């Protein structure tokens, strides 16, 4: 027995379609990462460190959108897995600088594969050109609505 279809008008509201696609995407990525004993915040921090280099906890929070209070737990988990190193900042020994370790780079390589697999599953109904166009359009929407100083979202692990 197939579910009752949504009313046609609901299937034409972009915000509703985006929300539905976001739920599916979040579930797919979350399940794939959980199978690797990881979550999307681990991935975000590892990517940020790999691309931008060592950073303070506050800078990582700004760049990833993860609240500072939540960042502590994420960094503790990554440190426990030897994926990051915390060292006192040369200019201010009260502050820590977080950097990626070789184990963190290997972990990121594995998570990159996991994320890519989830993206392939999510976007399977689309051609390569449609996938590229979707990414371009979503980027435009996101950039257009980005506040001047984005506030990190709470609890979106």
Describe every region a protein language model picked out.
Residues 19-22, 47-51, 112, 139:
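Short, locally clustered residues in the helix-turn-helix/winged-helix DNA-binding domain
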Residues 12-16, 36-47, 69, 132:
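Short alpha-helical elements of helix-turn-helix
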Residues 54, 76-143:
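Charged, amphipathic alpha-helical coiled-coil/dimerization segments
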Residues 57:
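Helix-turn-helix DNA-binding elements, focusing on the entry/boundary residues of the two helices
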């Amino acid at each position: 027995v197939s579910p009752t279809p949504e009313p046609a008008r609901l299937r034409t509201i972009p915000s509703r379609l985006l929300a539905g696609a976001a739920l599916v995407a979040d579930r797919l990525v979350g399940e794939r990462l959980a199978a690797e004993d990881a979550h999307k915040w681990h991935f975000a921090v590892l990517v940020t460190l790999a691309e931008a280099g060592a950073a303070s906890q506050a800078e990582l929070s700004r760049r990833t959108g993860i609240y500072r209070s939540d960042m502590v737990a994420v960094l503790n988990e990554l440190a426990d897995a030897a994926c990051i190193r915390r060292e006192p900042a040369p200019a201010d020994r009260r502050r820590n600088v977080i950097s990626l370790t070789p184990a963190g780079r290997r972990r990121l390589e594995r998570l990159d594969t996991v994320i890519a697999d989830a993206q392939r599953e999510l976007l399977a109904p689309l051609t390569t050109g449609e996938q590229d166009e979707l990414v371009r359009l979503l980027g435009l929407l996101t950039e257009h609505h980005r506040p001047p100083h984005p506030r990190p979202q709470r609890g979106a692990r």
